[in-house]
Design a protein with these regions (language model features):
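Lectin-type carbohydrate-recognition ectodomains
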Residues: 31-36, 70, 82, 96, ...
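Feature marks extracellular polysaccharide-active and adherence modules
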Residues: 44, 59, 65, 73, ...
Length: 213
C-alpha cells in the first residue's frame, strides 16, 4: 500500500491559490501553495492546497477544515520542505500529508471525511520524516489509510480511534518519541504493515495497542 500511495501524490489543482485575507493576518489556500512565508494558513472546507517543493514557512499555525486536503512535501523529494509554527490543526479533514518539515506547537488531527473522494480518489493522512516539537494527537480518522513514520517527536504521541478501510493501515513505525506512545481503539491495530519500518524508539512508555510496535 505504501508504494501505491506514494505514486498518487500529485496535486491537480489551480495554479494560483494563496489569497491573503483582510489585514494579511491569515491566508486562504485553495490550490498550489507558492514557496514563501505565511502567517496563519487556512485550507477552507472542501479545498485542496499544497506543494511538493517548498520551502514554505507558516508562522501562525496551519488550519485544515472539514473535507479539505493539504499536502506539504513528498517522500520522493527528501529535502526540508516546511517550517510550521503554531501547530497543525485539522478537524474532519479529508487528507493531511506532511513530509520533511519542522513543526512547533504540536499536531492535532481529529476526525475525517470518509475513505473515498478528494483529489486522489481515496483519502489518507501521513506524517513522515518530520521534527515535531509538541504532542501529537491523531484521533478518530475515518479515511482509507493512515501512517506515521520516521518522525522525531519532542512530546507524547496519542493515536486513538482511527478506523480505516485498508487492512494495511495505521502503520506507526521508525519514530523517535521523547515522551509516551499511547494507542487505543484503532482498527486495524497499529502495525508495521508493508512499510519495512522498524520499532519505534520511545523514551517514555508504549501503551495499549502500541505496546509492541
Amino acid at each position: 500500500m505504501r508504494k501505491w500511495i506514494a505514486g498518487l501524490v500529485v496535486l491537480t489543482t489551480a495554479l494560483i491559490a494563496a489569497v491573503p485575507t483582510a489585514g494579511a493576518s491569515s491566508t486562504t489556500c485553495t490550490g498550489e501553495l507558492a514557496p514563501g512565508s505565511y502567517h496563519k494558513l487556512i485550507v477552507p472546507e472542501g479545498a485542496v492546497c499544497g506543494t511538493e517543493a517548498g520551502p514554505v514557512t507558516i508562522r501562525g499555525g496551519l488550519y485544515v477544515r472539514a473535507g479539505a486536503t493539504f499536502v506539504l512535501g513528498s517522500e520522493e523529494n527528501p529535502v526540508h520542505t516546511g517550517t510550521i509554527r503554531g501547530g497543525v490543526h485539522a478537524a474532519n479533514a479529508m487528507s493531511v500529508q506532511i513530509h520533511f518539515s519542522t513543526i512547533s506547537g504540536g499536531v492535532r488531527i481529529r476526525g475525517g471525511s470518509g475513505p473515498f473522494g478528494g483529489p486522489f480518489g481515496v483519502t489518507w493522512n501521513t506524517l513522515e520524516d518530520n521534527v515535531i516539537n509538541g504532542s501529537v494527537w491523531m484521533t478518530g480518522y475515518t479515511g482509507f489509510w493512515e501512517g506515521f513514520f520516521r518522525n522525531i517527536v519532542h512530546g507524547s504521541v496519542n493515536y486513538n480511534d482511527n478506523t480505516l478501510v485498508d487492512p494495511d493501515g495505521n502503520e506507526v513505525q521508525s519514530n523517535t518519541i521523547h515522551g509516551n506512545l499511547n494507542c487505543s481503539g484503532n482498527d486495524p491495530a497499529p502495525q508495521q504493515g508493508d512499510s519495512q519500518g522498524s520499532p519505534n524508539v520511545v523514551t517514555g512508555q508504549k501503551t495499549g495497542q502500541c505496546s509492541g510496535v
